Amino acid sequence: MTSKNTEIHLFRHGETDWNVEGRFQGIKVSKLTEKGVLQAKQLGNKLKNIKFDNIYSSPSLRTKQTAYNIWPNKKDKIRFLDELVEIRLGRLEGKLYSDIKENDFTSYDHFFNKPHLFSVEGAENFKELTNRSFKIITKLSKNSIGGRIAIVSHGAFIKSFMTYIDQKQIEEIWNPPFMDNCSHNIVLFNSENSFSITRYAGIDK
């Protein structure tokens, strides 16, 4: 990392009860499972020697719990931003994948298989999510030029951003690598206002 680059570390939250149950989460409340808490603590142990100039998190309970378990001694340093929340899914939130697949197959199919076509009343589409994720991460990167920041957010949020800066299309958003719980991504932001990926879902590039 040169002095002109911002190093951005993006983390997905730990496993939640709704992950286990197979529910659409969005901005509704779900909480970490015991496994999810352990994942966050293990991640925190791996990061213990890395100094972050700023730590940001989505204010959702699952990301808040993840951030607190990663940095238990820095709870007062974590800043929670509404712009980092997961894709808003409207009436799908809290519903089982299996129920939506059976009763609203088009929405299910578009979300998982044709994300560029996904459109549900009261929900964000993936273009809107991509614009939101890119805008806030660019802003936070510019605020810490030459520094290192951490962002705890959500699977679709991070995937939308990574897909965009990797110059891929929205329809490719769910292509591998899969964004596992507590996945660690690293991106560099340079003085020319461009991003480059150095780690994607735990895989170094």
Q: Where do the model's predicted regions map?
A:
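Generic beta-sheet signal
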Residues: I8, G147-A156
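Short, basic/glycine-rich phosphate-binding loops at helix/coil junctions
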Residues: V20-R23, T106-V120
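Phosphate-coordination/substrate-recognition cap region in phosphate-metabolizing enzymes
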Residues: G44-D109
